[in-house]
Amino acid sequence: MLMKNRIVKFVVLVCCLCSMPGIVRAQLSVHQFDQLMKKIDDVLWYEKVGDIAHVDKVILCGPPRWKEFNPTSMSAGNELKFRAYIFIPKSVDENKKYPLIVFPHSGVHADMDTYYAHIIRELIAQEYIVVAADYRGSTGYGSGTYNNIDYGGLENEDVYISRNYMVDNFDIVDGNRVGIMGWSHGGMITLMNLFNYPGQYKCGFAGVPVSDVIMRMG
């Protein structure tokens, strides 16, 4: 039933988009379009990996903004919400524990989408549990999340929080066998997590990572 509901929403979204006059589509903001595409892509996860994995998406809370837009507002100092995808092999035995892979997506102002489905399938086939955070600055959630980017900063904390969420809330996750992997910007987040929390990860892989943030920002 859940899958049918998602498919119905997918069809409605596509039909609405296709039925809009060209001038109306052109007036859609970039963030509105990103949000629409995100909803569609979330449905596609079930098509891409749903045969071998349980797919879920949760809302987590990371640290407050590094610099508040309005320090005197009532919301100043509040934690920031972000989303994280969870992929669990359908073959798991609930009486056993399995290794966890933390998988930060690549790209500045990008997101975790089905572009990575082939990687998720490979990890699931080897019975890894995967958590992939859409950390602050990711696209698909509107201008608020987008503008809260903290390049090389608190985005690393968001990813670490996704790791802790899995270890603390899933009995089938082996907290002593946690790895982290990512490419490009995700590779940088991988390195930062390994440096900042060396005792929390058994291994890591950083593919073509940003390794000098000062040079990159300069």
What are these regions (language model features)?
Residues N5, N169-F170, Y197-P198:
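Acidic-histidine catalytic/liganding microenvironments
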